[in-house]
Amino acid sequence: MSPRPPAVSPLPPQPADAVSSDVPPMTDPTHDSLSAEAAAWPDLSDRLGRPRGGDGARVLAVTSGKGGVGKTQVGANLAAALARGGQRVLVLDADLGLANLDVVLNLSARITLHQVFTGEADVREALVDAPGGFHALLAGSGLVEYSRLTPEVRDRLQRLLQQLRPYLDVIVLDTGAGLSDVVLYTVSLADEVLVVTTPEPTALADAYATIKVLDRHQRPRPLHLLVNQVQRAGEGAALAAQLQQVLDRYVGPRPPRLRLLGEVPSDTAVRDCVLRRQLLLEQAPGSPAALALALAASRLMAAA
């Protein structure tokens, strides 16, 4: 058996080969030509502006191993900061059966992704304008049909992104927490991944497990880390360095390289905005947490 990580580490003492065999191997999404079908897709220019040209939007999956780390708040506020910088941004609630982006943003939608996927509506009807200057696609809640990855869900997610990419600069996928097959497939569709964690040992352990599984089952991509709810300056950087050391030692032969996108301090303004269902960058733009998220967004753009 491989040696355990140092006892002082809050990260999980397990070797790289301890990944559960229950996790399905993930393959890269196919990018086959859909030109005939694309010609029949609705023109989204009236909602999203004229197509941008080039390769289309960057797709960023915001994910976490553990729930309750502030992943959706982080994704929404990053989107607002990017929109302030002139980017066309859309946040897609990819937690298809247990959505909460609508709760965080105090939004309601007559049409959700469920209606789009079932053909009851097209994507134009589901697009909503979010506070902060970005667009959102909201999902449903309590929908058991999205608890497992089916061929239909795979196909609908992939084609939806192909439809949206030409019109946007950045698409943020707000995934569910954990390592379900739906979460892993959603992450596989992204160009880059942001793992959100907190200094809590269980959150760090789950972040480590998430990174390990992505490294083992998916293609290499830029991998960002954001440490939320830190208690002191520099805590996030120290935890990121510690996490990288554990990856270097136990995940091989070529361990993933983490890029620390930022650390967000514990801030009462965040709790106030959560309770009021308000966007932090809109309601408390000068708060320490909002400033940290704005800095993280600028680093994300610099990494493009």
Language-model features, listed with the residues they occupy:
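Extreme N-terminal, non-catalytic leader segments
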Residues: 1-68
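Conserved catalytic-core segment of NTP-binding enzymes
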Residues: 166, 170, 175-262
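Conserved nucleotide-binding/hydrolysis micro-motifs of P-loop NTPases
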Residues: 96-98, 141-144, 178, 200-202, ...
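P-loop/Walker-type NTP enzyme "switch/lid" segment
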Residues: 91-166, 269-279
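Walker A/P-loop phosphate-binding motif and the immediately C-terminal alpha-helix
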Residues: 48, 56-95
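Beta-strand-loop-alpha "switch" segments that mediate conformational coupling across diverse proteins
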Residues: 251-281, 293
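NTP-binding/hydrolysis catalytic cores, primarily Walker-type P-loop NTPases
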Residues: 275-304
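Short, hinge-like loop/turn segments at secondary-structure boundaries
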Residues: 106-111, 213-214, 240-244, 280-281
